[in-house]
């Protein structure tokens, strides 16, 4: 799983996502990518599950880039606990994503195989996505 090595604060306020992605919204490394169409929070488990699904489809060919990193902690209170008594303990990490952000990129395999691999990865994610091809190909 993806986790930060060191953070300044253990817990964080939820906040709110507004607007579109200003950076990371173009295919930069690969030939084809998976782009988000709505706001969302992707946990490290979801990011890894999508990566595994795509890599199993393309097998040994090609290279894949993950363009997001889960650096925000999320907390949970124990089961059967009443409300109050402070914020729960950190249980995992998530990456906030805005519309337009490219999540994964693939290079080195034919476009149909890469398109199918990214479709399989998209099924593992809780947000709507689309497949984009790098301009000039």
Curated annotation (Swiss-Prot):
Gene3D superfamilies: Ribosomal protein L10e/L16. Keywords: Ribonucleoprotein, Ribosomal protein, RNA-binding, rRNA-binding, tRNA-binding. One of its GO terms (cellular component) is cytosolic large ribosomal subunit. GO terms for molecular function: rRNA binding; structural constituent of ribosome; tRNA binding. PANTHER family: 50S/60S RIBOSOMAL PROTEIN L16, LARGE RIBOSOMAL SUBUNIT PROTEIN UL16M. Binds 23S rRNA and is also seen to make contacts with the A and possibly P site tRNAs. Part of the 50S ribosomal subunit. Belongs to the universal ribosomal protein uL16 family. This is Large ribosomal subunit protein uL16. It comes from Oleidesulfovibrio alaskensis (strain ATCC BAA-1058 / DSM 17464 / G20) (Desulfovibrio alaskensis). The lineage of its organism: Bacteria, Pseudomonadati, Thermodesulfobacteriota, Desulfovibrionia, Desulfovibrionales. The gene is rplP.
